[in-house]
Each structure stands twice: as structure tokens, then as C-alpha cells.
């Protein structure tokens, strides 16, 4: 049956237990995510996923008190999913009363079941109302002693695929400093200290993707030593980014105009990442701009 091709994860549980962080983690794993979906729309949502021509194979939704219809209709919606042949799992998040009270006080938000105050009373009321739903959950996570980052990592380990949870998506972008540093860069490399092919007439119209330009740059011992040491640094730090739960890293490589040196170094970094099976992309932001006639490199 077509509908069985979509894996649906329903996230629910106590208010303040970390459902938003869990959903964000799943989004990083490639899930199509919807927050605060009313139970009456769950079946329709699942049907739409099956009509995506394979673009949506995993989806996650959060159903909680904000949905308005409350959980009395959630059981009915899940029953409809089962009858229609959809595979779904329930992730139930909870935490101790003490921890939840502390989180509400820290955020200065009101509990949805106690709009006039009385945080603890609202928590206890909600816990009682969710007893039956908790009993049918496929997985229960107690977030009392978890930081947001630890929760995201635990969700990724439980519901992410092996490739997404074990690898980091790395974007390498070369650029020219005179056109400004990309705003989303995490790691920045300035390679303006390397020999500049711009001052070699036959290399000037080429970019750092061309073998002649790369040979010129890496024939310099300093350039080769720099690349070797930087790749060694990446070899060391990337696994720690993965362990910490980071899913996307942007490495910016800049030279004056973004045509020669930064492009060549970015290409070498991209090859390194590809050889180690990281999800990666290389973009040369300013190389084409310079080839159109900008004389300052």
C-alpha cells in the first residue's frame, strides 16, 4: 500500500518537556515537520505526504494542548491512520514536576491548563490527562536531566537514519573579501597570504578550478603546508561537531577577489570532505563576477 511508504512520527507529551527541540532535531534529519497540528488534520496530512511523489518519506508532527481539540480526538485520529494502513510511532516526552515548574518560571510562560497561574497544578492535571496516551507510546523520553542539545542528539539517535546522524553537512564557499564575507560562515579562512595568480598573465583569466592555477598555487611549499595543516585540523574537529549535534557547517575561504586562491583552496577542502563521505557542497560565490572584468584581485 502506498501509504505505508511514509513513516509518521507523532510527538506529544507534557508541556515544557521539549517537543519543539525534538521537532527541530527531526527536521535536521530530513523529516517534513509540522508543529501544533490539530488531531482532526492528521489523516489528511498523512494522505498529502503520500501524494508528494516520494518527496516526503518521513514526517513528524507535534500534537499538544495548543491544538485546541485536545487529546480526546487524538486517539480517534490515530485509529483512522491505522485503518488506512499508515505506519506511525508515538514519541512521548515528559519531565519531573520540579523541572517543568523551573522551566516555566525561567521562560515566564503560563501553563496552558492554568492560564491564571498555578503552574504545578496545571502540570499535574496534564500529566493525569495524558496517562492513557503515555501507555500506548512507542518511546518515552524523560528530559529532566537533558539539555536542549542532549535531547536533540538523543532524538536523532532514536529516529534519524544512520547517514544523517553520523555525518555533518558541510558547505564550502569561496569568496572575495572586497565583496564582503558571507553572513552564514562558521569557519573563516583568509588565504590572501598565498601567491596570487592574478599577476601571471596567462593565469589571470582562469579560476582556481583550472589545473594550471592549482599547480601554480600548490607548487609553493607554504600553500601545500597550509592546506595539509588545515585539513588536519578539520580531521580533528569535524567528529566533535557531529558529536555535539551540529548538522550544518559553513566554511568560508576568502582571497581578495574570490577568483583564484580561495577557489583552489575550497576545491581542495571539498575533495577532502568527499573522500571522507561527508555530505558536502562547494560554491564559488565571486569567481564568475571577477571573470567579467573586475581588475582588482
From Swiss-Prot:
Keywords carried by this UniProt record = ATP-binding, GTP-binding, Nucleotide-binding
What molecular function terms (GO) are annotated for this protein?
Answer: ATP binding; GTP binding
In this chain, GTP is annotated as bound at 64-67
Query: In which domain of life is the source organism classified?
Result: Bacteria
Kindly list the residue ranges recorded as spanning the membrane: none
Keyword GTP-binding included in the entry's annotation: yes
Question: Does the keyword GTP-binding belong to this entry?
Answer: yes
Which residues make up the binding site for ATP?
13-20
Q: Which Pfam families match?
A: PapZ_C, RapZ-like_N
Q: What is stated as this protein's family in its record?
A: Belongs to the RapZ-like family.
PANTHER family assigned to the protein according to its UniProt record, in alphabetical order = RNASE ADAPTER PROTEIN RAPZ (PTHR30448:SF0)
Q: What does this protein do?
A: Displays ATPase and GTPase activities.
Task: Name it.
Answer: Nucleotide-binding protein DSY4845
**Native organism:** Desulfitobacterium hafniense (strain Y51)
Amino acid at each position: 500500500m502506498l501509504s505505508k511508504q511514509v513513516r509518521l512520527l507523532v510527538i506529544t507529551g507534557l508541556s515544557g518537556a521539549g517537543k519543539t527541540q525534538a521537532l527541530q532535531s527531526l527536521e535536521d534529519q530530513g523529516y517534513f515537520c509540522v508543529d501544533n497540528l490539530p488531531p482532526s488534520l492528521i489523516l489528511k496530512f498523512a494522505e498529502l505526504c503520500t501524494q508528494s511523489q516520494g518527496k516526503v518519506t518521513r514526517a513528524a508532527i507535534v500534537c499538544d494542548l495548543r491544538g485546541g481539540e485536545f487529546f480526546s480526538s487524538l486517539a480517534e485520529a490515530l485509529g483512522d491512520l491505522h485503518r488506512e494502513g499508515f505506519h506511525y510511532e508515538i514519541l512521548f516526552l515528559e519531565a519531573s514536576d520540579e523541572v517543568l515548574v523551573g522551566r516555566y518560571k525561567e521562560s515566564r510562560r503560563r501553563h496552558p491548563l492554568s492560564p491564571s497561574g498555578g503552574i504545578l497544578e496545571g502540570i499535574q492535571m496534564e500529566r493525569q490527562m495524558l496517562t492513557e496516551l503515555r501507555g500506548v507510546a512507542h518511546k518515552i523520553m524523560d528530559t529532566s536531566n537533558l539539555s536542549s542539545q542532549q535531547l536533540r542528539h538523543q532524538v536523532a539517535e532514536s529516529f534519524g537514519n544512520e547517514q544523517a546522524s553520523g555525518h555533518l553537512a558541510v558547505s564550502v564557499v569561496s569568496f572575495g573579501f572586497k565583496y564582503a564575507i558571507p553572513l552564514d560562515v562558521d569557519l573563516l579562512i583568509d588565504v590572501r597570504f598565498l601567491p596570487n595568480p592574478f599577476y601571471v598573465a596567462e593565469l589571470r583569466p582562469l579560476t582556481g578550478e583550472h589545473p594550471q592555477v592549482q599547480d601554480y598555487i600548490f607548487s609553493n611549499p607554504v600553500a601545500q603546508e597550509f592546506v595539509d595543516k588545515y585539513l588536519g585540523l578539520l580531521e580533528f574537529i569535524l567528529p566533535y561537531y557531529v558529536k555535539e549535534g551540529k548538522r550544518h557547517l559553513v566554511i568560508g575561504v576568502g582571497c581578495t577577489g574570490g577568483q583564484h586562491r580561495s577557489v583552489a583552496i575550497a576545491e581542495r577542502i571539498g575533495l577532502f570532505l568527499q573522500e571522507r563521505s561527508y555530505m558536502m557542497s562547494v560554491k564559488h560565490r565571486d569567481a564568475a563576477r571577477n571573470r567579467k572584468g573586475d581588475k582588482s584581485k
